[in-house]
Amino acid sequence: MVDAITVLTAIGITVLMLLMVISGAAMIVKELNPNDIFTMQSLKFNRAVTIFKYIGLFIYIPGTIILYATYVKSLLMKS
């Protein structure tokens, strides 16, 4: 049976990965031409994209390090 820490770690890694993907997509959309239809669609959409852009900027490097450390830890546990 799998212990609770393993399940919580898997859930945490999944949430972090999804947040990194959404934030990365927001950075891509934000870097498009300002006259593009995505950024001119609505103020709420532009605000949401900006928030995810800042989240992406703040978690990109730490998130990558955490995901890599977890991967290395799982490799060491298999040995």
From Swiss-Prot:
Membrane topology (Virion surface): 30-47
Membrane topology per record: Multi-pass membrane protein
Intravirion side: 1-8, 69-79
GO cellular component: membrane; viral envelope; virion membrane
Top-level taxon of origin: Viruses
Transmembrane portions of the chain: 9-29, 48-68
Assigned keywords, A-Z: Late protein, Membrane, Transmembrane, Transmembrane helix, Viral envelope protein, Virion
Triggers of expression: Expressed in the intermediate phase of the viral replicative cycle.
Disulfide bonds: none
Homology family: Belongs to the orthopoxvirus OPG081 family.
Chain's role: Envelope protein.
Protein name, as recorded: Protein OPG081
Name of the coding gene: OPG081
